[in-house]
């Protein structure tokens, strides 16, 4: 009976090892991608968003950095990323905040941590992100009554200052294809800011980005 029990234990451990090796062999590849994105962003103004909606205009920017895919199973990966991105928003002329047309641009470092689910060459991913604003500028267009003004935004406790740290969530999908020795993924993603980034009124980042992700194709 003891001998039989020992044999059963050995068989269980052997089965576990085989399963782990199989998962490792057939899981998604672990890789590092170079990321280049086109980003369209705007602000949601919280309780004032309905009043300002007709004045809002998107700001185009760029995003570049790196994306690490850690394959865990054939259908699931963990994806931490690090990149530099430009966000912001525009209010058209006659808006109730700046009167003249104004544009805010924020220059940030961003770290998303995503869960990615694979379906052949397609995938979907979502997860939280943390961002830090290095600097930014607000430009107010000129008029006969108000001169043009471009100033660097501040990050103190003053009424018109901004907050450096931001948290939010991202969700999107992508498609992977191969070209010669490169693996290329096209990724479309929406970003939803969860924290207010300014002191004087509600401002939450919103953004849509289309990115190209390139890594060396596995043989």
Q: What residue spans do the PLM features occupy?
A:
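Short glycine/proline- and aromatic-enriched beta-strand/turn motifs that initiate or cap beta-hairpins
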Residues: 28-70
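Bacterial Sec-dependent N-terminal signal peptides
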Residues: 1-35, 212-218
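Flexible, solvent-exposed loop segments that connect beta-strands
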Residues: 43-56, 86-107, 134-165, 198-200, ...
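Structural signature of outer-membrane beta-barrel domains
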Residues: 39-43, 85-89, 131-135, 191-195, ...
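Residues on the lipid-exposed face of transmembrane beta-strands in outer-membrane beta-barrel proteins
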Residues: 34-38, 64-72, 82-84, 111-117, ...
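Predominantly the C-terminal beta-signal and adjacent terminal strand-loop region
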Residues: 157, 166-169, 174-219
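Residues that define the transmembrane beta-barrel architecture of outer-membrane proteins
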Residues: 28-30, 58-62, 105-109, 120, ...
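Outer-membrane beta-barrel channels and translocator barrels
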Residues: 27, 73-75, 119-122, 178-180, ...
